[in-house]
Curated annotation (Swiss-Prot):
Chain intervals annotated as zinc finger (FPG-type): 244-278
Function, as annotated: Involved in base excision repair of DNA damaged by oxidation or by mutagenic agents. Acts as a DNA glycosylase that recognizes and removes damaged bases. Has a preference for oxidized purines, such as 7,8-dihydro-8-oxoguanine (8-oxoG). Has AP (apurinic/apyrimidinic) lyase activity and introduces nicks in the DNA strand. Cleaves the DNA backbone by beta-delta elimination to generate a single-strand break at the site of the removed base with both 3'- and 5'-phosphates.
GO biological process: base-excision repair
Name of the protein in question: Formamidopyrimidine-DNA glycosylase
GO MF term (any one): 8-oxo-7,8-dihydroguanine DNA N-glycosylase activity
Domain of life, per lineage: Bacteria
Similarity remark: Belongs to the FPG family.
Reaction catalysed by this enzyme: Hydrolysis of DNA containing ring-opened 7-methylguanine residues, releasing 2,6-diamino-4-hydroxy-5-(N-methyl)formamidopyrimidine; 2'-deoxyribonucleotide-(2'-deoxyribose 5'-phosphate)-2'-deoxyribonucleotide-DNA = a 3'-end 2'-deoxyribonucleotide-(2,3-dehydro-2,3-deoxyribose 5'-phosphate)-DNA + a 5'-end 5'-phospho-2'-deoxyribonucleoside-DNA + H(+)
Organism field: Mycolicibacterium gilvum (strain PYR-GCK) (Mycobacterium gilvum (strain PYR-GCK))
Chain sites annotated for binding DNA: H93, R112, K158
Length: 282
């Protein structure tokens, strides 16, 4: 699933091309793509037609297009959603097609159909306007108003695994399995440690590591392991070449040379160095 850097790459690409444009045509090709919009495809189409896109926004893994009437198109990419500008190469997975007043085609393509669009009102939360369905999502480490000290205090009160807390979007958003493992590796913390047992200084270091690794990933267009994640031009990111932990089971740690390991975690996997990131004693 795309994480913060991948979604931000898409947001930036959209911002440069759709801001200020008017929607002149909309077609929903698959009803599942708008299943979160309770009023249905016809309502979404009617409300989008002739709307002006006034900007783009993102919090964590959620992306949205703000409209002139004060509402927003909330986009969740799911496992394989793509927001593409220009002609679509494979229309088999085209779910929503939008035509802008300058002739630009904006398409939502989703092979697995886990993602989707919905319309929602904007609400003000802690001084920022966000779509109502996103109001419960915490700020992410790249948000200018991200409060590291406050998040550290929240984590210190959590008597559960630190990696589980990194993935909790109500604590800190935007971090998924890949960047959680990368952040934990950089901070030399095993994800199985209890958050409450990690010092405030070390938790601050971990959040700084998350900020740094996602900034690095953003600079390289995000992480693409297959063709499912691409930017608005259909191009893959290449941060997968720079990963230090994720997917490196059986390879030497880039820092100490120990052989990287993989453990099962929440129907996923955790990758770590047994020397730099020793598991907590039971």
């Amino acid at each position: 699933m795309p994480e913060l850097p991948e979604v931000e790459v898409v947001r930036r690409g959209l911002a440069a091309h759709v801001t200020g444009r008017t929607i002149s045509a909309v077609r929903v090709h698959h009803p599942r793509a708008v299943r979160r919009h309770e009023a249905g495809p016809a309502d979404l189409t009617a409300r989008l037609l002739d709307s002006v896109i006034t900007g783009t926004g993102r919090r964590g893994k959620y992306l949205w297009l703000t409209l002139g009437d004060g509402s927003a198109v909330v986009v969740h990419l799911g496992m394989s959603g793509q927001m593409l500008l220009g002609p679509v190469r494979n229309e088999n997975h085209l779910r929503i097609a939008v035509l802008l007043d300058d002739g630009t085609a904006l398409s939502f393509v989703d092979q697995r159909t886990f993602g989707g669009w919905m319309l929602a009102d904007l609400v003000t939360v802690d001084g920022s306007d966000v779509p109502a369905p996103v109001a419960h999502i915490a700020r992410d480490p790249l948000d200018p108003l991200f409060d590291r000290a406050a998040v550290v205090n929240v984590l210190r009160r959590k008597h559960s695994e630190i990696k589980r807390q990194l993935l909790d979007q109500t604590v800190v958003s935007g971090i998924g399995n890949i960047y959680a493992d990368e952040s934990l590796w950089r901070a030399k913390i095993n994800g199985a440690r209890l958050a409450s047992g990690v010092s405030k200084a070390k938790l601050a270091e971990l959040l700084d590591a998350a900020t740094d690794v996602m900034t690095d990933a953003l600079a390289q267009g995000g992480t693409s392991f297959d063709s499912l994640y691409v930017n608005v031009n259909g191009e893959s990111g290449y941060f997968d070449r720079s990963l230090d932990a994720y997917g490196r089971e059986g390879e030497p740690c880039r820092r100490c040379g120990a052989i990287m390991r993989r453990d099962k975690f929440m129907n996923r996997s955790s990758f770590y160095c047994p020397r730099c990131q020793p598991r907590p004693r039971v």
